[in-house]
Amino acid sequence: MKSILLIGLGRFGRHIAQELNELGHQVMAIDSNEDRVNAVLSYVTNAQIGDSTSEYFLRSLGVGNFDVCIVTIGGNFQSSLETTSLLKELGAKLVVSRAERDVQAKFLLRNGADEVVYPEKQLAKWAAI
C-alpha cells in the first residue's frame, strides 16, 4: 500500500482516485474546487480544498511523506507547472504530472516531474489498435 498525494480532481483525477482506492492505496486528494473535493470523499483517505500553487499550502501537507505525488491539473498548464516545481522543491520523492502536448512534457520534466503521462495521447493510441 502506498501513500499518494493526488492534485487535481477533474475527470482524469477523479478516475485515478477511484482506481487507487480499488488498489488499496491511501490517497490524499486536493483541488481548489469544493464540489470536486466533495465528489471524491467516499473513495479517498482524506481530501482538502486548497491552492496547489501555494508553497505554504503544499508545505502544510508534508509532501515529502507521500510515496508518490500525482499532478492531474488540466486546462491550466501554468498551475500544473508551478505545482510540479513546488512539489519537488519541497521534497516530494516521486512526481508524476499530466501533459497534453510534447512541449508541456519537456517543461514539466525540466521543472521537477519524474514522469509525465499523456491521458489523451495514450487513449488515442489504445483506440487505434
Q: Predicted segment positions?
A:
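Cytosolic regulatory regions of ion transport systems
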Residues: 1-129
